[in-house]
């Protein structure tokens, strides 16, 4: 048994039911689980946890409005349009309600995005995948992306601040904490200075930082800061962590299959932070088991 949860990311599309997923996880030594944003109400109907513990809910869950639809409609907590923003807040509230119902401690929150032309980021990613990050054309594309983001960021951040204050008040009434997750894409919120802003809104311990190791490494690989900066600046505010590995920009590998500096990660993780293995379903059960053992060896996870 381990002090780490297994995300349903590894189960959706692989098992017929959540019960089957929990059973498979238990066979691998898991007693804790995170429900992610691919779990809808139909999957939850009649669910018997049978003693399994849900430690965290990754919004939007239940995903009756899929994440893709929320993004396409800009129904996000960062939306400048008030109706869209309220729809985004409502989606997170549904996840808070579910956390309260299931006894989860934390809702993992995506704080939205900066509304810019995402083709700017796609162009940069394409150059990276072509092996051209040291060429002038990459630096130029990166500069265009950063400038576009900077010109728009405060407009979206105003909406995020307002949304977060509302959500923190709602979550506090249910005894739920909100973990603001660092994101994979550069145009998404937050960057480190934005996270510092959001963690100091006056929401107290209700709002903390949820560190995603693969996302931080992806941004470093693209040339946007360092992975360690997130941990150094916000290590004391970490309430949870998504553990997965990455090669280049290909993330959600089982730990040990990529290039994450796990010794560095382990140095910063608070003992009481929730830990979740967020491995994609392309990882075999053998790779998953080996990944957890790797995390134990590196000091990121404890065997109980």
Describe the residue ranges of each PLM region.
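Conserved beta-strand edge residues that scaffold enzyme active sites
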Residues: 39-40, 61, 113-114, 185, ...
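Histidine-acidic metal/acid-base catalytic patches
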Residues: 1-4, 8, 12-26, 41, ...
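Glycine-rich, proline-tolerant flexible connector loops at the mouths of alpha/beta enzymes
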Residues: 36-56, 117-118
């Amino acid at each position: 048994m381990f002090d780490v949860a297994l995300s349903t990311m590894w189960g959706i599309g692989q098992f017929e039911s959540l019960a089957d997923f929990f059973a498979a996880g238990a066979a691998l030594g898991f007693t804790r689980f995170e429900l992610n944003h691919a779990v809808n109400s139909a999957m939850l109907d009649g669910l018997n946890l049978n003693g399994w513990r849900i430690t965290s809910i990754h919004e939007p869950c239940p995903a009756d409005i899929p994440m893709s639809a929320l993004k396409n409609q800009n129904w996000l907590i960062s939306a400048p349009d008030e109706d869209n923003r309220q729809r985004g807040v409502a989606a997170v509230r549904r996840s808070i309600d579910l956390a309260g119902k299931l006894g989860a401690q934390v809702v993992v929150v995506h704080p939205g995005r900066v509304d810019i032309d995402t083709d700017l980021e796609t162009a940069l990613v394409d150059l990276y995948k072509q092996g051209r990050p040291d060429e002038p054309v990459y630096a130029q594309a990166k500069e265009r992306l950063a400038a576009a983001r900077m010109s728009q960021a405060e407009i979206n951040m105003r909406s995020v601040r307002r949304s977060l204050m509302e959500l923190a008040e709602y979550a506090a009434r249910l005894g739920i904490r909100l973990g603001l997750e660092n994101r994979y894409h550069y145009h998404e919120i937050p960057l480190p200075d934005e996270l510092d802003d959001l963690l100091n809104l006056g929401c107290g311990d209700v709002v903390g930082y949820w560190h995603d190791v693969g996302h931080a490494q992806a941004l470093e690989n693209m040339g946007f800061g360092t992975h360690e900066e997130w941990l150094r600046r916000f290590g004391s505010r970490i309430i949870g962590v998504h553990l997965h590995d990455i090669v280049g920009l290909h993330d959600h590998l089982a730990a040990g299959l990529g290039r994450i500096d796990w010794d560095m990660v382990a140095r910063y993780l608070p003992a009481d932070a929730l830990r979740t293995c967020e491995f994609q379903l392309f990882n075999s059960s053998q790779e998953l088991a080996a990944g957890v053992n790797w995390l134990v060896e590196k000091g990121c996870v404890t065997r109980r």
